[in-house]
């Protein structure tokens, strides 16, 4: 019996391309509508997102629109939680599609596993050609290092999960989302869950699809910001980064540093060429064995997507060191 009330929290901003399909997927959820509330927190969209949401909210009383005048995701999530009345919180993203049993499976596995945060693997799907290439990069070990939450068949405990679901009281007790974190807010929350003895569980029974950025320039901006705010996360918690998080930064420093030194030294020029050649061979190999793409031209574009992810994240990581390392970043106790 699904008698517990569930609040679905959805941050939105200029999502007119995706919002209608997303809202329809919410209407198709098999969780009883009398025990469901859907809170769409809008960052003052300038496209037709708000109009579309309002038209649905007028028809369906369990949907409501909340304004987020501060625009960014972490504020939206906390506003949603503060305006919620459910025993459970399920976070969703409008840039995605969800299976009909998504909410009910989240609640089922929260009960079954006694984990503090439960979700499914991040399955990335594209609509346009470029989106499909970028989606393939998410499943490429060379691009993201094979993170467990990007593996479609992974089930078990992990250090993070996209979106997630929680008991509301627990989420409030650990301080909800850190409003100083416009990026990496999920990682920060999951770190605090683990720090407080909680567990994070992923199961492929919880099914969804995420739509990635539509252009390489948007992908660059996204991963640059991830790199910047990863430093804030490291600084806040005093947690040493994984070796894999250093690799993009080392690659960028190598490209720029050895590239400049190659003008003054033949030895550095040869090392620079050798390094780029090795990177290109590895990128070529992992791109061309990727089964998500078929055509040679798409696999070549995948090489470019991998490169964009590496350079943008590495450059952001370096920028984050300059931005945060000498600043008085406050450490939270929650």
Language model region names:
Residues 1-28:
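N-proximal low-complexity "stem/linker" segments adjacent to membrane-targeting elements
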Residues 4-7, 37, 188:
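Cell-envelope/extracellular polymer assembly enzymes that use nucleotide-activated donors
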Residues 42-51, 70, 93-99:
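A conserved acidic beta->alpha catalytic loop
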Residues 68-84, 105, 157-162:
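Glycine-rich, basic loop-to-helix element that forms the pyrophosphate-binding segment
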Residues 89:
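Short aromatic/hydrophobic "clamp" motif used to bind/position activated sugar donors
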Residues 100-132, 136, 207, 211:
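Conserved donor NDP-sugar-binding/catalytic core segment of glycosyltransferases
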Residues 110, 178-241:
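Catalytic donor/gating beta->alpha subdomain of glycosyltransferases that bind UDP-sugars
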Residues 250-327:
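Membrane-embedded multi-pass helical conduit in multi-pass membrane proteins
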């Amino acid at each position: 019996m699904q008698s517990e009330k569930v609040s679905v929290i959805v941050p939105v901003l200029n999502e007119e391309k995706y919002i209608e399909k997303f809202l329809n997927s919410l209407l198709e959820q098999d969780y009883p509508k009398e025990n469901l509330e859907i809170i769409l927190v809008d960052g003052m969209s300038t496209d037709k997102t708000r109009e579309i949401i309002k038209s649905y909210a007028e028809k369906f009383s369990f949907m409501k629109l909340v304004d987020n005048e501060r625009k960014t995701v972490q504020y939206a999530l906390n506003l949603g939680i503060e305006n919620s009345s459910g025993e459970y919180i399920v976070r969703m993203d409008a840039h995605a599609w969800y299976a009909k049993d998504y909410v009910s499976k989240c609640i089922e596995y929260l009960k079954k596993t006694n984990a503090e945060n439960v979700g499914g693997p991040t399955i990335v799907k594209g609509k346009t050609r470029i989106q499909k290439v970028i989606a393939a990069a998410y499943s490429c070990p060379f691009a993201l290092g094979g993170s467990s939450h990007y593996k479609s068949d992974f089930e078990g405990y992990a250090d993070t999960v996209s979106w997630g679901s929680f008991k509301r009281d627990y989420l409030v007790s650990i301080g909800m989302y850190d409003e100083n974190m416009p990026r990496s807010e999920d990682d920060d929350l999951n770190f605090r869950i683990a720090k407080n003895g909680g567990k994070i569980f992923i199961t492929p029974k919880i099914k969804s699809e995420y739509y990635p950025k539509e252009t390489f320039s948007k992908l660059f901006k996204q991963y640059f910001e991830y790199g910047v705010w990863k430093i804030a996360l490291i600084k806040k918690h005093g947690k040493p980064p994984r070796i894999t998080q250093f690799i993009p930064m080392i690659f960028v420093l190598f490209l720029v540093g050895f590239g400049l030194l190659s003008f003054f030294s033949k030895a550095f020029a040869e090392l620079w060429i050798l390094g780029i050649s090795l990177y290109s061979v590895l990128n070529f190999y992992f791109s061309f064995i990727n089964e998500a793409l078929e055509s040679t031209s798409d696999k070549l574009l995948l090489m470019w997507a991998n490169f964009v992810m590496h350079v943008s994240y590495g450059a952001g990581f370096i920028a984050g060191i300059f931005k945060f390392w000498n600043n008085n970043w406050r450490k939270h106790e929650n």
